[in-house]
Curated annotation (Swiss-Prot):
The name this protein goes by in its record: 2-C-methyl-D-erythritol 4-phosphate cytidylyltransferase
EC numbers: 2.7.7.60
Species annotation: Acidobacterium capsulatum (strain ATCC 51196 / DSM 11244 / BCRC 80197 / JCM 7670 / NBRC 15755 / NCIMB 13165 / 161)
Domain of life: Bacteria
Phylogenetic placement of the source organism: Bacteria, Pseudomonadati, Acidobacteriota, Terriglobia, Terriglobales
Record-marked site positions (Positions MEP for the nucleophilic attack): 163, 219
Gene from which this protein is expressed: ispD
Pathway field: Isoprenoid biosynthesis; isopentenyl diphosphate biosynthesis via DXP pathway; isopentenyl diphosphate from 1-deoxy-D-xylulose 5-phosphate: step 2/6
Length: 239
């Protein structure tokens, strides 16, 4: 069994730029405690012995820049940089097309801008995929969740969803390679776009299990997220 990791990193980071006074650059290039966010993410997966290779999908005009970072931090033997697409789904699909896998192999998909994923959680996700064929990291809901209907007057609550039925999906999301390929092929044939890989796999009829996540496995999206991530990182270093 081999484990391949796909890191979609072709986003523009428009939400981060909207609230920032600094010159705009994609989130994966921002520095967290002096090291690019993407490099923190690569380090976490490189620390897991089961991981065979990582594929980073970036915008075509950023391939050279990312490859230079990969080389600078010594990941060139384990990381490939490929051209992504205009959406997350396109980027993952293009990266997946470069993976030569067999029936026993596993593919993990992880947001490049979740730099604080812990190697132990990655390992547990791999174990869960070995058992069930599909698993994601999820964080149990702590707030009361309301279902709403959008109207001209604003959002109207239509139901309260019990928290025990809710998890906030995180990454990595892992699948047997052939299952993920089939899910992407069916989605493309039907013109379906999902917000994550699990939604495509669910649609293909497979059951997806959940591995407990952590609040520190945050996605850097908004201004202020870098400061919070730095706090988590310093806290982890002081253990």
């Amino acid at each position: 069994m081999r484990v391949f990791v796909i890191l979609p990193a072709a986003g523009l980071g428009t939400r981060m730029a909207a609230g920032s006074h600094t010159p705009h650059q994609p989130k994966q290039f921002l520095e967290l405690e002096g090291v690019p966010v993407l490099i923190h993410t690569l380090r976490a997966f490189a620390a897991v012995p089961a991981v065979s290779a990582m594929i980073v999908a970036v915008r075509p005009n950023e391939i050279e820049r990312v490859q230079a970072q990969v080389n600078e931090y010594g990941f060139q033997d384990k990381v490939r940089v490929v051209a992504g697409g205009d959406s997350r789904q396109q980027s993952v699909s293009r990266a997946l097309a470069t993976v030569e896998c067999d029936a026993s192999d596993i593919v993990l998909v992880h947001d490049a801008v979740r730099p604080l994923i812990e190697p132990a959680v990655i390992a547990r996700t791999i174990e869960a995929v070995e058992k069930s064929g599909a698993a994601i990291v999820g964080l149990p809901a702590v707030d009361t969740i309301k279902q709403v209907e959008r109207t001209a007057a604003g959002a109207i609550i239509t139901a309260t969803i019990p928290r025990e039925y809710i998890v906030q999906a995180q990454t990595p999301q892992g699948f047997r390679c052939e299952l993920l390929r089939r899910a992407f092929a069916e989605a493309e044939a039907d013109g379906f776009t999902g917000t994550d890989e699990a939604s495509l796999v669910e649609r293909a009829g497979a059951q997806v299990t959940v591995v407990p996540g952590s609040p520190s496995n945050m996605k850097i999206t908004q201004p202020g997220d870098l400061e919070l991530a730095a706090f988590y990182l310093r806290q982890r270093s002081s253990r």
